[in-house]
A protein has these predicted regions:
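Metal-dependent phosphoester/phosphodiester hydrolase catalytic core
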Residues: 1-264
Length: 264
């Protein structure tokens, strides 16, 4: 194990310069024993600060944490979301994101964590990203259309706050609108994790829906499945598929491979 300490200067609201400290432990890579992972999802505001979960996680002493998405919800913090203007939307998100840090920060001080955004993290009730395209204006309350509701600047803030500690992306080239990507590989404890997004590149139901009502709700069995099973539709996207083809062939220093996503 190695101890670490981060010092950072900050000028407070009174103009005073202060030095703040953040310290913890970087634990030895657990390559000689079975890896213990704790996986969490959907941190809804009614459970904040999730004390029973945190208490049990401390008791279990996992080697690594996995937060698979919805680290924030629109209702978190007791205040509604603000979609615009852009900077207000970003501050609105950050306030809710800080609450996630307050709840789980002490654990993450000493335990490595994988964190991946999902739909609610970018203020959507469902997300069919279409490779990063924008949603048509005036459709913020429709959960069955392809694209991102919020601006790319805000989405990039979400991606940076939640994923910047991960290994570098397999292919860092931004997608539509200049949106950052974060799909990557992490080896820990002789386990190789492929970390992907099954939301960002996904085609939307509006491309196939020929039924009444919500486009993402099939209420009657389809007579012809070819309507929704077309070669031009994407789930993980070609770029992530190329990554997975490379990842699955490399078994150097690993015993098992695990694919991490949000909601297949």
């Amino acid at each position: 194990d190695h101890q670490y300490r981060i010092l950072y200067p900050l000028t407070d609201i009174h103009g005073n310069n202060q030095i703040f400290e953040y310290s913890g432990t970087i634990k030895k890579d657990p390559v000689n024993r079975q890896l213990k992972m704790a996986a969490m999802t959907c941190q809804f505001h009614t459970g904040f600060p999730y004390s029973p979960v945190v208490k049990n996680l401390k008791f279990k002493e996992p080697d690594i944490l996995y937060f698979s998405g919805d680290q924030i919800y629109e209702q978190n913090g007791g205040y509604p979301i603000k979609r615009e203007p852009e900077n207000t939307a970003i501050l609105n998100y950050l306030g809710k994101w800080y609450m996630f840090g307050w709840a789980f920060g002490e654990l993450m001080r000493d335990i490595p964590a994988i964190c991946t955004p999902d739909d609610h993290d970018v203020f959507q009730g469902n997300l069919w990203g279409g490779g990063g395209i924008p949603r048509p204006s005036g459709t913020a309350n429709s959960d069955d259309l392809m694209g991102f509701t919020q601006t790319v600047k805000m989405v990039n803030v979400v991606n940076t706050t939640q994923c910047s500690h991960l290994p570098d992306p397999y292919d860092p080239e931004p997608i539509e609108q200049g949106m950052k990507v974060w799909y990557t590989c992490l080896n820990y404890g002789r386990v190789s994790f492929a970390i992907v997004s099954d939301r960002v590149f996904k085609s939307g139901p509006d491309l196939v829906a020929n039924w009444e009502g919500r486009k993402d709700h099939i209420t009657e069995p389809l007579k012809d499945l070819s309507v929704i099973d077309r070669p031009d539709l994407e789930l993980l996207g070609k770029r992530q598929e190329i990554f997975l083809q490379s990842w699955i062939r490399n078994w150097e220093d690993v015993d098992i491979k695990v694919l991490l996503s949000q909601t297949l």
